[in-house]
Amino acid sequence: MKRTCKYLSYGAAAVLIVMMMAATVVEKLHGTPVAFQWFYHSPLFLILWAVAAVAGLVYLVMAGTPKRLFTMGLHLGLAVILAGALVTHLFGESGEIHLREGETLASFELEDESPATLPFSIRLDAFAIDYHHGSRMPSDYRSDITFLPEGTAVRISMNNIAKYRGYRFYQADYDEDGKGSILAVSHDPWGVGITYAGYLLLLLSMIGFFFQKDTVFRQALRRVATMTAAVAFLVLVPSVSASASTRDVKKALGEMYVYYGHRVCPFDTYLQEKGLDAAVESLDKMKLFPLADSTGKVSWYAAADDLPESVYEDQDLWTFIRKSPELVKESVSSGDEAGVLQVLNGIKAYQEKTASSVIPSPRKVKAERTYIRIARPKAQFMLCLALGIVLFVLGGVLITRKKKFPSWVLIAGAVIALLIWLYLSLVIGLRWYVSGTGPYVGRYNVMMLMAWFATLAILLLYKRFPLIEPLGFLLAGFTMLLASREGVSPQIMPLMPVLQSPLLSIHVLSMMMSYTLFGLVAFNGIMGVAVPSAEAREDLRSVSLVVMYPAVFLLTFGTFLGAVWANISWGSYWAWDPKETWALVTMLVYSFTLHGGALKPFRNARFFHWFTIAAFLCVLITYFGVNLLLGGMHSYGS
């Protein structure tokens, strides 16, 4: 019975992993309805989850796991989450309601487009859009509604929901004319509560697990503490920007302002990305000229744009806007540097006079101009990769021979890691200050954040786990390589309203920390496969296990915190979006490595290392593959 339950549980989980992988591909090829019909809502899919949960719990009880409180709590928490999801699937309702200003309705449309009746009426009193300061990018959408007949008035906005009689209303969309609002409606009085209880139990159990005695994690930690392996290191040279050929012209051009990337920024941002010649050539197409309307709202125009009627009534202003870019081009062509500077300084003076309320502060401009000159980590990634490869090979040789590096070598490596970490901290900090948002969205941001975590891991762990140095530098090098391919000055844009949530910050940080740790495990697996000594392979397996537990727990925490954020933002804590599906796949795949006690192959060091190398493909697909190939709601981060 015990053996049967074990095979049923792990077998069902393995089949579910394959089904979810296939479902994301089918969704891309044949559409979401087909994927839900064939996979997510199919009887087989539900049965497999039930078998995995029930058989797994029975096996744990028969194996004596209840004696280990937190280990049992981990698995029980997952079972409670599945129970809540089943209740939501069977009894929950969700859809949307479309209201025009002044309109009252007592029904909404379900996801299958059938009507559903509300036990009350809802009226839209007003709808409004807030914009980022000096930008046309929305910062929030607001619907003022009244529930009738009670007359309860509430305001719904992004990440600010309304709850009424067991129903929840979320700001989902709006009409193009700004006179209508579309609200998402969710009615799931039991499923959400059960699922949240599972999340809480899971979180408490993950924290308690690290204090639990006689676990595989504790055994691996003790083995690693007695290892003799160590690693070495070299030197860092920070990158230096090249000087411009026509320094004064480039400086004057860079100090102007431009409306670019849905925000007002120094022209230097565009200049560093495109180069001086291209910037001058496209000057008439750049939004350099702010104009205020009768209400005082400032909009930015290019010389080639259709200008407001008021400009044509002011001949001097019209001439200034239309002719200034042409004068700059002509002066550059003729080598008249003084003429170029005169026109550029005139444009800047006009900008400061007309748009003083929306242009960035001098301190923020200085920060951005510094940032764009150091944002591309080309020298840093090449250094990290070179050192990582050398130390990786050298470390493998030393492990095989059971030798240590001198302590001064490890200290030298830590100094280099510190310099890289300080550089990354400066770049991330400057970008954060300029944009006003943390490094949580976009490939450049996330890659730099992963490199930051990798170098921080070196600084924190190199004394106890010397192998962290080559592994950390390899990971930092690869992630900075990917970041450098995003352009000289990666675009800074205001965040979409739905992304302006502190839960998103914690969610992304948790996910990126887990991905960083999985990357370290993958590199450690490569070394484990390469070394000829069986004892060395076992030592490296222990290192991987010590890293694997916090990595899996961070991924689990991040995934379910993302579900809470999604539920708050748009009323659905799980939508089988390709990104969240692959995050779940990754979590399940890596969880197999933590069950060596039940799964004999994972007690074999060579198999374990090969598995961790292959498993990292799931991380790559989750982050890169989904954004580039599969799409879905999370593709905003691409």
Where are these regions (language model features)?
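Solvent-exposed, non-transmembrane regions of integral membrane proteins
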Residues: 1-638
